[in-house]
From Swiss-Prot:
Other notes: This protein is sulfur-rich (Met and Cys rich).
Gene name of this polypeptide: 2A11
Domain notes: The presence of a 'disulfide through disulfide knot' structurally defines this protein as a knottin.
Pfam families the UniProt entry points to: CarbpepA_inh
Tissue: Fruit specific.
Disulfide bridge positions per record: 59-75, 63-78, 69-92
UniProtKB keywords: Disulfide bond, Knottin
Official protein name in the record: Fruit-specific protein
Entry-linked InterPro entries: COpept_A_inh-like
Amino acid sequence: MAAKNSEMKFAIFFVVLLTTTLVDMSGISKMQVMALRDIPPQETLLKMKLLPTNILGLCNEPCSSNSDCIGITLCQFCKEKTDQYGLTYRTCNLLP
């Protein structure tokens, strides 16, 4: 009985060791991510067109017309704004 328990413990240890070795060798833990703190408005608009995840229609989301701001939100007006560099862009806003 004691021999079976020790064999079972060794088998579990071996499986855990093999799994952690394979995961480490696959390079998942070595993945590097580069992020920007302030994304320029042009890239934000591109993100909005390519990845439309805004189902609820949040405030300050990029838009091109009022129809882009529809959803379950109070901010249903697309308003033009200017950033600190003088570039103009449009976001969903509470007031027209």
